[in-house]
Amino acid sequence: MERDFLGLGSKNSPITVKEETSESSRDSAPNRGMNWSFSNKVSASSSQFLSFRPTQEDRHRKSGNYHLPHSGSFMPSSVADVYDSTRKAPYSSVQGVRMFPNSNQHEETNAVSMSMPGFQSHHYAPGGRSFMNNNNNSQPLVGVPIMAPPISILPPPGSIVGTTDIRSSSKPIGSPAQLTIFYAGSVCVYDDISPEKAKAIMLLAGNGSSMPQVFSPPQTHQQVVHHTRASVDSSAMPPSFMPTISYLSPEAGSSTNGLGATKATRGLTSTYHNNQANGSNINCPVPVSCSTNVMAPTVALPLARKASLARFLEKRKERVTSVSPYCLDKKSSTDCRRSMSECISSSLSSAT
């Protein structure tokens, strides 16, 4: 079939397309007009409708089979023929297959199918001719049989590819405001908290953290033991049965011998003051010290510590005696001392 669009080509140039459809099917195709889609770039005459209805001369020339010359120019069939062939594609493999000879693959132009309605593509062939092709019926021209209409590369207009709306529509409109507090590894959530209350809580928390914390030292209280006994007259009891409590004073005087051993020689004793109420109860003891400047410790030393201290002193005494320069027996040391004292006394008497 040969078509001349916009007077750019002559009618003498041969063009051939192998058609296997009848003329009755071409007549049944709807004769539509196409509006020029580039009206804002060309002259006012482009707003007219371009008819694709085949003429009588074209129908007579379609009855024969022609070969496409290797001139580099190629013109597709009319829109009505392509539309009619795509409608009859599913009937049979013979009627639905359309073959296009591949004259020159480097000089062919293929239109990309677009799914938008009313969109037309305008191409210029290498030979100088221009043609219009409907994108809904565009087919590749490389000699491949076409069994189905082309697939669109763009989504339909109704589909939504992406959106930038805030995803808060799923939340209910009247949802209560919540306050979440993270403190000491725990999470606390409170409902119905207004922004003003939240700000006030944050201010209180900030002010509370800046306030200095005053810690009072823990007070140690002595345990007071109350002894409850029957009515017993303390004056009738012998003094040996009276309880006594002894305290070791750190400031007490101590006697030291020549070997460096120390012995505690002073202690404090306390007696019970009996304040009998109705002759039945005995109150706690009150310590009485001989001197006011000596303070008795609150806790007495245990007996085990006393025994270990005594053993330590004995061991130290033994070490000191073994290291002394005059390692003599006790008897010899006493004899030497006596002889020295006698010599000193005799010398003093002779001097006088």
Swiss-Prot record:
Changing residue 181 to A: No effect on dimerization, but loss of interaction with TIFY9/JAZ10. It is found in: Nucleus. One of its GO terms (molecular function) is identical protein binding. Residues 1-71 are annotated as: Disordered. The keyword ATP-binding does not apply. One of its GO terms (biological process) is defense response. A motif (Jas) lies at residues 302-326. InterPro entries: CCT_CS, TIFY/JAZ, Tify_dom. Ubiquitinated. Targeted for degradation by the SCF(COI1) E3 ubiquitin ligase-proteasome pathway during jasmonate signaling. Homo- and heterodimer. Interacts with COI1, MYC2, MYC3, MYC4, TIFY10A/JAZ1, TIFY10B/JAZ2, TIFY6A/JAZ4, TIFY5A/JAZ8, TIFY7/JAZ9, TIFY9/JAZ10 and TIFY3A/JAZ11. Interacts (via TIFY domain) with AFPH2/NINJA. The tify domain is required for homo- and heterodimerization and for the interaction with other TIFY proteins. The jas domain (302-326) is necessary and sufficient for the hormone dependent interaction with COI1 and the hormone independent interaction with MYC2. Belongs to the TIFY/JAZ family. This is Protein TIFY 6B.
